[in-house]
Amino acid sequence: MKSLSKLVRTVDESQIIEFFQESVGEWCSQRRYYTLPDGETKEMMSMITIRFLEQGCDELQKLAQIHKLAESVFLICGAEVTWCSTDVLKNRSESEGSTLFGALGNILYRDRGFATSKPVTAQYNFPNPKTLCLRTEYNGSVFEEELKLIGSKYRTRQTIISRAGEQLMIGQYIEKRIVQ
């Protein structure tokens, strides 16, 4: 049974490597957030750049230190994501920044969360090779996210944010690759 679990982990790890490599490039992200239950919407557009991070690189070593992982533990791969976002309805700059992702086993380590600047972890899995599902929990909230690669030029994302079992917000995204 132990070897089966190792095999499953190896499959997940090879899938996350491939998923991050296929996501490399510049993307235009259009998204809409729905606040529940009142339905208030917010429309955003972001320019996103994704860079693949190889095992052992400085960024992944720093990420492992932030998460207090043993020095003998190496994240298998990762991605650096930078963004610049604009509120479409208000026609003003909303945010810009970057975040690091690093994978080990079925855990995705991040240097910050969606709603916190503190390091967070997410459980991840692949229902199929082109769809990455994440579940992150912190500050009493649960973030469930699905990222789906559609061919080589498009991605869709959906995020559901819940607290105490009640859904608070849904984010839906369509992302178009600009440069690979």
Swiss-Prot record:
Keyword Lyase: yes
EC number: 4.-.-.-
Protein name (record): Putative phycocyanobilin lyase CpcS 2
Function: Covalently attaches a chromophore to Cys residue(s) of phycobiliproteins (Potential). In vitro does not act as a chromophore lyase for ApcA1, ApcA2, ApcB, ApcD, ApcF, CpcB or PecB, the lyase activity is therefore unsure.
Pfam family, one: CpeS
Induction summary: Induced by nitrogen starvation.
GO MF annotation terms: lyase activity
Originating organism: Nostoc sp. (strain PCC 7120 / SAG 25.82 / UTEX 2576)
